[in-house]
């Protein structure tokens, strides 16, 4: 359960005004606390209200190689059809490569001035308005990329649920001050309900009687974009994150001891204190003729030190548990996240194009006909097929997949071209000992020119 504290300047979370279209409605603390209050009044909620409408899974739960094998088995079983599909896949990879490389280059150029992990020489520091403006551009550029990567944004109601509900098997609880944040936003994909993949964790065997892992709702990937008033834009990606544990991913948090754990520690202190006072205190009082008030004062000081030590040790163990969890769940940060996100968007782009190509090939008339009717047919067919193959209810974007397919250049050739140098050949060309005498031979392009059509928008 999240413990929320208020700042001295009021109870409003000021959402960055430069991002109205990106962050949606203003996330005021009053609105968020109202929804949190509603969840506190519920008896043991297990998921956000209207969860099926709030979150729709859009991620295709197969890798490109797995999808190719499934499509070949069902739709391209003959050797000629298999070869044609593999050739088409190479064509899609080649065309999308240029587009997403261009997208990554633009993102890196936008992010470089505000990159907190830059290893190059320091540049002149930016003013706060300049930094906010750069962050706005980066986040606006990430919005369509996240959509193409099939991440789904988590709503404010979902965030309120995650901040209130604490799963009994989560030993670590945290405290944050919402007034310290300018904005925070979460995206997720790969919703699962089941036993989470569990790494060895500190303190997981502290008790003899420990309930087995329960089935939980978690996400295979979660992306966080948050900024504190005294910090910078934080971009992080995590794996295998439970819905009730989103608050543990935020920066500027403090570990706290739960009410149950505090009660257990207090009872332990009281029982041990009474035993100590009866067995030791009474002997000291009778043998040393010490005043009762002085003995009680010394006893209170001793118990205070013991309580501080016990609670401090407990918080240290929980902080170590939290650090251990974040170490194993973190997948990429900041600039590295941009590269990983572009690769994921390119992969989802390719898979959507392959599905559109394979399904429209078996439709009478193919892609001919009204685009709206074609995209609806494609969406329905692919969603039913994915449900049958994976058991996952995926919301497939038929309109976007059809646009990807139609944006491809018509020519399908051999990719990479036969004349494209290999890495070992490049090393040979760069060696002065093996350099050819004809300098003009080095001026030949190492690859084909960029296609005139950029795939996707």
From Swiss-Prot:
GO cellular component assignments: membrane; mitochondrion
Pfam family membership, one: DUF3754
Organism of provenance: Bos taurus (Bovine)
Compositionally biased region (Polar residues): 429-439
Classification of source organism: Eukaryota, Metazoa, Chordata, Craniata, Vertebrata
Region of interest: Disordered: 429-457
Record key words, sorted: Membrane, Phosphoprotein, Transmembrane, Transmembrane helix
Top-level taxon of the source organism: Eukaryota
Record-linked InterPro entries: DUF3754 (IPR022227)
Membrane topology term: Multi-pass membrane protein
Membrane-spanning residues: 264-284, 285-305
Entry's localization field: Membrane
Major location (coarse): membrane
Protein name: Transmembrane protein 143
Phosphoserine carried by residues: 316
């Amino acid at each position: 359960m999240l413990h929320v504290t208020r700042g001295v300047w009021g109870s409003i979370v000021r959402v960055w005004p430069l991002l109205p279209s990106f962050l949606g409605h203003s996330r005021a603390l009053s609105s968020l606390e109202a929804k949190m209050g509603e969840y506190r009044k519920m008896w043991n909620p297990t998921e956000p209200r209207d969860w099926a409408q709030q979150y729709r899974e859009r991620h295709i739960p197969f890798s490109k190689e797995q999808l190719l094998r499934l499509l070949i088995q069902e739709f391209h079983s003959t050797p000629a059809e298999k070869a044609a599909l593999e050739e088409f896949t190479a064509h899609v990879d080649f065309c999308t490569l240029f587009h997403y490389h261009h997208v990554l280059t633009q993102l890196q150029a936008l992010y470089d001035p505000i990159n907190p992990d830059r290893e190059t020489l320091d540049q002149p520091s930016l003013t706060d308005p300049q930094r906010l403006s750069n962050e706005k551009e980066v986040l606006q550029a990430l919005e369509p990329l996240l959509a193409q990567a099939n991440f789904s944004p988590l709503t404010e109601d979902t965030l309120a649920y995650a901040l209130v509900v604490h799963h009994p098997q989560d030993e670590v609880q945290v405290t944050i001050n919402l007034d310290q944040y300018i904005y925070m936003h979460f995206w997720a994909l790969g919703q699962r309900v089941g036993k989470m993949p569990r790494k060895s964790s500190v303190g997981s065997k502290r008790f003899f009687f420990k309930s087995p892992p329960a089935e939980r709702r978690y996400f295979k990937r979660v992306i966080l974009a948050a900024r504190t008033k005294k910090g910078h834009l934080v971009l992080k990606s995590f794996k295998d994150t439970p819905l009730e544990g989103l608050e543990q991913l935020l920066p500027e948090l403090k570990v706290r001891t739960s009410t149950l754990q505090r009660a257990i520690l207090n009872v332990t202190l009281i029982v041990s204190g009474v035993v100590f006072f009866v067995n030791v205190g009474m002997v000291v009082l009778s043998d040393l003729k010490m005043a009762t008030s002085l003995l009680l004062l010394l006893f209170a000081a001793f118990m205070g030190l013991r309580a501080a030590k016990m609670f401090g040790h407990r918080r240290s163990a929980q902080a170590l548990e939290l650090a251990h969890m974040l170490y194993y769940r973190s997948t990429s940060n900041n600039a590295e996240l941009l590269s990983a996100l572009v690769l994921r968007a390119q992969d989802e782009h390719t898979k959507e194009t392959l599905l559109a190509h394979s399904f429209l090939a078996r439709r009478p008339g193919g892609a001919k006909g009204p685009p709206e009717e074609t995209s609806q047919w494609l969406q329905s067919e692919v969603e039913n097929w994915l449900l049958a193959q994976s058991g996952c209810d995926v919301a497939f974007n038929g309109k976007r997949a059809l646009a990807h397919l139609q944006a491809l250049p018509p020519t399908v050739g051999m990719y990479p071209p036969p004349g494209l140098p290999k890495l070992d050949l490049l090393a040979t060309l760069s060696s002065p000992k093996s350099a050819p005498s004809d300098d003009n031979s080095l001026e030949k392009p190492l690859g084909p020119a960029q296609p005139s059509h950029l795939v996707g928008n």
